[in-house]
Design a protein with these regions (language model features):
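Non-catalytic, usually N-terminal nucleic-acid engagement modules in DNA/RNA processing proteins
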Residues: 1-24
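Short loop/turn segments at strand-loop or loop-helix junctions that form parts
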Residues: 1-6, 30-43, 99-105, 155-159
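Surface-exposed cleft-lining segments at the edges of enzyme active sites
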Residues: 3-11, 39-51, 70-77, 104-110
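Acidic (Asp/Glu)-rich catalytic clusters
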Residues: 19-32, 60-66, 89-95
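Structural preference for beta-strand elements that scaffold enzyme active sites
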Residues: 32-35, 68-74, 96-100, 130-134, ...
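Active-site-adjacent beta->alpha loops and helix N-cap segments on the catalytic face
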Residues: 45, 49-58, 108-121, 140-143
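Distinct, well-ordered alpha-helical segments
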Residues: 80-91, 110-123, 144-147
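C-terminal accessory extensions appended to soluble enzyme cores
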Residues: 139, 144-169
């Protein structure tokens, strides 16, 4: 199965060490909102690999919230059924007030971007709640997202990418 080497380190620590790291973050950062890790879903791996990644996202979200750090649940999905699962999960957890999504990678491709925006809008309706969406990229579908969520915070990827590529804004 596929791995996300950069964020796999989180799981190399036992739960007590993860709780300690979250407590350190809470003390050092003060009032913040974090987004949970975006464990990738891949098309070329067994389906249960995706479901395992979604489970890890939910566990990481809970560990932050349980540790007193406000967290946006990252919605990573490949199928309509994945979005339905997330809607069911969120509907049963009133402590979920913020969700996150990123259009910076394959979800931001033309065609796929619009599909994800429509799925996110359907997700928001299915939860029956006023959720705040934190979204990275996706300015082209911002109107769809803004009409579906109570609030949207857009994190622009342009400045970051130009910095990485050492280009002027």
């Amino acid at each position: 199965t596929a791995t996300d080497p950069v964020i796999e380190r989180w799981w190399s620590h036992e739960a007590p060490r993860r709780r300690s790291a979250i407590a350190e973050l809470r003390e050092a950062a003060g009032e913040v909102l974090v987004t949970t890790p975006n464990y990738s879903l891949f098309r070329d791996v067994p389906r249960w690999d995706d479901l395992h990644a979604m489970k890890r996202i939910a566990i990481a979200w809970w560990e932050f919230v349980d540790g007193g750090v406000p967290a946006a649940l990252h919605l990573n999905a490949r199928t309509e059924r994945d979005y339905e699962r997330w809607a069911h999960f969120v509907s049963n957890r009133p402590e979920v007030t913020h969700v996150a999504f990123e259009f910076g990678t394959s979800a931001g491709r033309p065609g796929r971007r619009e599909w994800h925006a429509a799925q996110l809008a359907a997700f928001a309706r299915a939860t029956g709640r006023h959720l705040h969406l934190v979204v990275r990229g996706g300015i082209a579908v911002l109107d769809v997202l803004a009409s579906a969520f109570a609030r949207v915070t857009l994190l622009d990827t342009t400045a970051f990418m130009k910095t990485v590529m050492r280009r002027r804004l």
